[in-house]
Amino acid sequence: MTIRPDIALPPDAAPPPEAPAKMSPMMEQYHEIKAANPGLLLFYRMGDFYELFFEDAEIASRALGITLTKRGKHLGADIPMCGVPVERSDDYLHRLIALGHRVAVCEQTEDPAAARARKSVVRRDVVRLITPGTLTEDTLLDARANNYLLAIARARGSAGADRIGLAWIDISTGEFCVTECSTAELAATLARINPNEAIVPDALYSDTELAPTLRELAAVTPLTRDVFDSATAERRLCDYFAVATMDGLAALSRLEATAAAACVTYVDRTQLGKRPPLSPPAREATGSTMAIDPATRANLELTRTLAGERRGSLLDAIDCTVTAAGSRLLAQRLAAPLTDAATIARRLDAVEAFAVDSGLREQIRSSLRAAPDMARALARLSLGRGGPRDLANLRDGIRAADEVLVQLAQLASPPQEIASAMAALQRPSRELCAELGRALADDLPLLKRDGGFVREGYEPALDETRKLRDASRLVVASMQARYADDTGIKALKIRHNNVLGYFVEVSAQHGEKLMAPPLNATFIHRQTLAGQVRFTTAELGEIEAKIANAGDRALGLELEIFDRLAGSIDAAGDDLRAAAHAFALLDVATALAKLASDDNYVRPEVDESLAFAIEGGRHPVVEQALKRAGEPFIANACDLSPGPAQKNGQIWLLTGPNMAGKSTFLRQNALIALLAQVGSFVPAIRARIGIVDRLFSRVGAADDLARGRSTFMVEMVETAAILNQASERALVILDEIGRGTATFDGLSIAWAAIEHLHEQNRCRSLFATHYHELTALSAKLPRLFNATVRVKEWRGEVVFLHEVLPGSADRSYGIQVAKLAGLPPSVVSRAKAVLAKLEANDRGQPKTLIDDLPLFAITARAPAEAAPPSEAEQLIDAVKALHPDEMTPREALDALYALKAKLPKAD
């Protein structure tokens, strides 16, 4: 019988079909197994196929694009059916899991011949429950990404102050973490963890406030209340980790323990009692990582672009790792930048050690390329899903550890993080490595059931059995030669398949000869095909039995050896996992050092101040794209540091035309801060960054039609979150606030937002806008600094120089950008005419906007209109505005022509 997983049925899932009073034994068995596994697609093994029936078949047919057929009837209606071949099932499983489906794999657990002897249906049992968060096979996993299962528990508080406990594990690597947060922090925490599956109590699944957030981020599986029972949580954790008390584990809060217990309970059930080895839950302290909400992660394209692609993201740009485990660790660090300056410094020390020693760095990277994914090999072996190549991976990992240790010995005084890695690499047993080396053959099969993975000479009993098996096969070869001579049929062959066993095969024309006396007494006709006829003999049957028995005995001995070796590995699991993590750590450190060396990154100074001073900053992703195109990136400085020595302002108000690079400038400074707190060198000449506790980005917006939100509503929701949550340690980048509504509405909102950031949040901020009127705020807000992106006009065209300078822009050059975008010439021409008229009308108004709007009355009043300057004064002002040292010869010549044009014309 199947072990019932007790996984609750999602509210929108149909129950399994009821079994009628009379049905075939096979269909009766199917209904029984399906009823024990509600809410999962049942892959029901029938020969060489997994078949799906009823609603499962309809779901799988749509999801996989395979033909929906029918098999018999149920309650008078056709039974929907579809199937997938067993040998290609991993491909189909991968697609179903990626769509959020969960699957129960039901195998035949006895030989069909035995079932026929019993005159009964073949026994079948569910041997695996596959869910998005509990994968271990390489064929189903992304090698460069973690596969997290997340459990969420909630405790109700007064006045809506609920607390959330979270626990997440990756059973393919053994990682296990817990934390606690408020409901306001939940979205940012979920975005950081990025789980593949979330398990929640039924009540939380139905919660109107939280459920939409959960379903946006992961496949959500609701479970019954007992899984989240806080009264039994500690007992379940102690049972899983085989400890007497929680003293042997981390000090967890009640909520954290509840979520952690839910995780291990779900794993225990989905793995049908097999327990993957997990590290004890590591507790993440509140505030230990930079908080980044989902919108900011998306806007900054940290791990995926807005189109959902890895290519073009920050992770893609900086990932120089050479191992899958290193790539996973880098992604983890990028998702959770640290807020502890001392820990950041230790990471930077490791990167610097390899940045200054390119020879050692490349030696380490070369050795790491040979290091396999030890953590995932361990997990597969512990769950009984491993193969001979997993054993070899662990053998090769220990060998690589010795090689890396020899190389690291060149460091006279290794930094703390490297020293810790060296200690971890020394932990695995070298005797275990030697034993694996003696046991495993050079050429290994993928599956242990294929045999042939034990080296000749390792086990004498196995060698003897193999000799007997192989000798029998030589007898078959000699029999073929003898049969060919006896019959006079030189083309006679002895072949083998799983249906007939060993058989004699001849052409159709020779078949009649073997079916005629006297040869028919020896050769028994079994099968006629289009061009061949097949026969068996009593002698062949005897030999086949000997070969089968010898082969079965040989495979049995090999499987015993495999289990013995796997047991030794399981006993050494903690040491091997520590070495696997050390490899990943060294891979990340050497990869970031290579990035720094290749792209001229510098070590940032990260401290507990509120400083933010970047000299020669660059956008890491855009710079790489330009480099591939053979173009330079224009670096820019940014100083948001507070205090008396402040050169500029804590809030920069950035104006300039479209396409000038404002958004790139905003993003690059956010990414530099993030990289610094990840523990990476940064793309700049110099960088000093005081710890950023929260990073906010409101750059671009799109409709959220599913929630009935317009583009402007999405923009306002994101802006509200920033203004309500940003502390003085936050870094805020805002682009074009208020552009999605009427001009005066948008201008008013942007104005008020700047004042709030300045007076209430008091955080480091970059604010880009096309509302040039906002630059007047610098007169009343002392920490507001106006900056602009430099452009040049040349013969009616605009040239973007991408330089950020003090000052403000008076034009946005929107029509020029529209022309570059390919608007029809007639539209561009008409737009210029309309703009000229609007600007003329604006100049003719007796009062400026700052006088018109009460909103702006708090700023300094505009001075009385002065008499227009004389022509001589205009010439003097024009000359004063020139900066010869900053001009190219061409620009100087143009300026001279412009001055000449201003001279009064002679009568």
From Swiss-Prot:
Signal peptide: none annotated. Residues 1-11 have a biased composition (Low complexity). ATP binds at G656, P657, N658, M659, A660, G661, K662, S663. Pfam families: MutS_I, MutS_II, MutS_III, MutS_IV, MutS_V. Keywords: ATP-binding, DNA damage, DNA repair, DNA-binding, Nucleotide-binding. InterPro entries: DNA_mismatch_repair_MutS (IPR005748), DNA_mismatch_repair_MutS-lik_N (IPR007695), DNA_mismatch_repair_MutS/MSH (IPR017261), DNA_mismatch_repair_MutS_C (IPR000432), DNA_mismatch_repair_MutS_clamp (IPR007861), DNA_mismatch_repair_MutS_core (IPR007696), DNA_mismatch_repair_MutS_N (IPR016151), DNA_mismatch_repair_MutS_sf (IPR036187). One of its GO terms (cellular component) is cytosol. Disulfide bonds: none annotated. This protein is involved in the repair of mismatches in DNA. It is possible that it carries out the mismatch recognition step. This protein has a weak ATPase activity. HAMAP family: MutS. Belongs to the DNA mismatch repair MutS family. This is DNA mismatch repair protein MutS. It comes from Rhodopseudomonas palustris (strain ATCC BAA-98 / CGA009). The gene is mutS.
